[in-house]
Regions:
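Hydrophobic adenine-recognition pocket in adenosine-nucleotide-binding enzymes
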Residues: 165
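Conserved class I S-adenosyl-L-methionine
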Residues: 189-211
């Protein structure tokens, strides 16, 4: 479902929800559960596949409500504390390039919490950059519109942040090599979704269903897959954590890259 369709669905739901919500919550839950059970009957394989497709829709609505509750910021930033990983692995006084910064949440945390840092967030989405620039930003944080496959802000940069970026890139090794050549970082901090986060991921793959958390993903890595790509690109993980269904890494450039 594209963004326009989602907006239409949500608009209709906002209008039609009030009579539905007049029913007691227990009754509403019972009706919905019954519908899920009815829809899953028949051949077990088909029923499981249908439930997993419905789960995708439910996840979309859950995330929409979470962002609304957070006044435009998903509470995962606060609850999973993944910002801390980036902050803790960036030394004071570092020049940081946050590639694919989105609305600037990670870049803002780094700029605010890493003493003496200079942070530039880059993205190619005008809407997200407008939201990032409109926030309460510290003086050591700025945002630039660019496609990093074509150009980067003037470096060198001591640290490059790739938070939920690599999975959106088809030629990830080529992309990383370009970043290392042009930005010349001392370290690269990476966050990607972990394929082995849940039994449902390989089950989805076995059933021929979508097993990505975003329709724009080309991959959701196993740890060995990510390590192989990083090695080919010229990066060596110094720190690796698997938390919250994600892989977090702080990498250094290998000597073979001349970094």
């Amino acid at each position: 479902m594209n963004a326009s369709c989602k907006r239409i669905v949500l608009g209709i739901a906002n209008v039609m929800s009030w009579p539905w919500r007049l029913l007691p919550s227990g009754l509403r839950e019972g009706i919905l559960t019954g519908l899920f059970v009815l829809d899953s009957r028949g051949e077990p394989r088909d029923g499981l596949a249908q439930l997993l497709r419905l789960q995708d829709r439910l996840d979309w609505v859950t995330n929409e409500r979470a962002v609304a509750m957070g006044d435009g910021v998903h509470p995962k930033h606060r609850l999973t504390r993944y910002h801390d990983f980036f902050v803790e692995h960036i030394p004071a006084g570092t020049r940081v390039l946050d590639i694919g910064c989105g609305v600037g949440a990670v870049a803002r945390s780094i700029a605010t919490r890493v003493k003496g840092s200079e942070v530039v967030g880059v993205d190619r989405d005008d809407g997200r950059l407008a939201e990032a620039r409109a926030a309460d930003n510290p003086e050591n944080l700025s945002f630039v519109k660019t496609d990093v496959c074509d150009s980067l802000p003037d470096g060198p940069w001591q640290a490059v942040v790739l938070s939920n970026v690599l999975e959106h890139i088809e030629d990830r090794v080529g992309f990383l090599k370009t970043i290392l050549q042009n930005a010349k970082p001392e370290r690269v901090l990476i966050r990607v979704p972990h394929f082995e986060r849940d039994w449902k991921m390989p089950m989805r793959k076995e059933l021929g269903l979508n097993y990505f958390s975003d329709a724009e993903h080309f991959i959701e890595h196993r740890l060995d897959e990510l390590n192989a790509e990083l090695a080919e690109a010229g990066l060596r993980p110094m720190v690796t954590q698997t938390l919250w269904g994600e892989i977090w890494m702080c990498c250094e450039c290998t000597e073979s890259d001349g970094q």
